[in-house]
Structures are given as C-alpha cells and as structure tokens.
From Swiss-Prot:
It comes from Lepidium virginicum. HAMAP family: Cytb6_f_cytF (MF_00610). Component of the cytochrome b6-f complex, which mediates electron transfer between photosystem II (PSII) and photosystem I (PSI), cyclic electron flow around PSI, and state transitions. GO terms for cellular component: chloroplast thylakoid membrane. Binds 1 heme group covalently. GO terms for molecular function: electron transfer activity; heme binding; iron ion binding. It is a single-pass membrane protein. Keywords: Chloroplast, Electron transport, Heme, Iron, Membrane, Metal-binding, Photosynthesis, Plastid, Signal, Thylakoid, Transmembrane, Transmembrane helix, Transport. Its main location: plastid. The 4 large subunits of the cytochrome b6-f complex are cytochrome b6, subunit IV (17 kDa polypeptide, petD), cytochrome f and the Rieske protein, while the 4 small subunits are PetG, PetL, PetM and PetN. The complex functions as a dimer. GO terms for biological process: photosynthesis. This is Cytochrome f.
Amino acid sequence: MQTRNTFSWIREEITRSISVSLMIYIITWASISSAYPIFAQQNYENPREATGRIVCANCHLANKPVDIEVPQTVLPDTVFEAVVKIPYDMQLKQVLANGKKGALNVGAVLILPEGFELAPPDRISPEMKEKIGNLSFQNYRPNKKNILVIGPVPGQKYSEITFPILAPDPATNKDVHFLKYPIYVGGNRGRGQIYPDGSKSNNTVYNATAGGIISKILRKEKGGYEITIVDASNERQVIDIIPRGLELLVSEGESIKLDQPLTSNPNVGGFGQGDAEIVLQDPLRVQGLLFFLGSVVLAQIFLVLKKKQFEKVQLSEMNF
C-alpha cells in the first residue's frame, strides 16, 4: 500500500513538473517570437515578393540597415561564409509581450541561388564552427534548401550571423551553371509591430479610434489601459484598449482628434534587406587564366633577356 502511494506521488510530481515546464516554454516563446521568421514560414510560400520586397517588412515597419558579406567568386563543391550583419545599439531595451523591458533579439532570412544550400556539419571547418557558435539554421521549406532562416537569437551575441554555405557543382547538378548569381538577405532586430492577422502588437503606437473628450482612463489589473472617449456631438462612447508596456500621452478630460496618438512609440528595432552577387567560377577557366598570365610573364622575361642580349651585341660591335 505504501509503495503504491509512493508511485502515485512520484507520478503526480512528474505530471506537475511537465505542466510547469510547458507553461514556462509557452510564456517565454510568446514573449520573444513575435513576428520572427517563423511567422513568414507559416504565412508565405516564398519570403521574397515579386517586387523584391521581403515579407518580414509586413510586420516590422521601421526601416533599419542590414549588410551581407560574401566572397566575389567561389569554386564548385566548396564551403564559404555568408556573414549577415544586423547592427543596433546594444544599450537599447524593447517592450516584451508581457509588458516588461528586455534585450533585443535578432533574426534573418538568407535567399540563395538555386543549388546553393546549408553546408553539412562534416564539411564545416573548425574555424567556421567557432564563428557560427550555437546557432541552428533551418530551411524555409523542406523543398527550398536555398532559403535559410535563423532566429530569434540574442542580439548582443549574434548581431553578426555566419551562414556556412555549400556551393553547387554543375558537374553533378545540370540545373546549375557557371554564372554570376544574386543573393538576398533580410534581417530584423526587435519585435514586430503587426501580427500576420493584421492585429497590433504592444510594440507600436496606438491611436484614437474616435475624436472627443477622454472621460475615463482605467488602469487594468494585469497592465494596460481602457480609455473611454465621448463624442460631444452625440454622446457616443468609444473604448480604446491599450496593451501593457506602453506609455500614455493623454490624460482624463483631454480633447483628442481621430487617429491622434494615445501612446508613445516604443519600437526601438526594425527590419532591413540587402543583396550581394557571387560568381560560381569554372576551375578550368581559372586554370586557363593562370596559364595565360604565366605565358605573359614568360614572354616579358624573354623580351627582357632578348633586349639585354641585343644590347650586349651592340656594345661588343662598338668596342670592335
């Protein structure tokens, strides 16, 4: 009987621990993942629109810089680095989903030419692995190995993200050719302002949905506000809900206009996109170029030697 009670107690403790862990995970994930690459994966078949705009800009409304560094040329079946830089002021804090202030996270999407893909672990050098750190990249879609996403990850540690890329080999992939190819990148720091369903996050400005007099501002128990606006012309009441974490710019009794900001803008992040070009070089072409350059150098040497020989002959004839 005692043994049965012991097993029952252990089972209850395990169940409680799992439940608590799941709750912590859900709360943590909800607070950091707003409008990161996973939203693009869920809602867009291709992250780059026909206009060239990367869809992350639909949720991250502020425009911020991003940069990418890749080699000018690569040889087939070789691994190279694509370094994405997402600069921002490390002292900045953002509003989290729970209304508190926290550090910024970053995310990126890298759109490679067809045939280029994430390098397998056994092809990555120790030096490159050290630059990559603990990052875990994933394909945008199982059938789109040339589109890679990462994030959210801590911005203070990964404001520069190194992607290990494997160049294709036209000898084994007939759809790939020795050409110059474009590479596109999008990078964000901080949370987005709009969710994919069109609703606002608490990381943006909230405007008045009606004009009139603010008759009441109610501070909610779990954070945030309810602002009651009364239209003086018809006494109609409108209640605007302000989520937690935002700073009000208005007060009771104040007269406001339609679309007037009720809060300050908390957003300190933003999204940017860029591009680069890379040449998939034919090794035979490189060998041919080296042979040509070698021939030119040899020709120059022979000309110099011939000139010196001619000068010696002229000098000997003059002495004779």
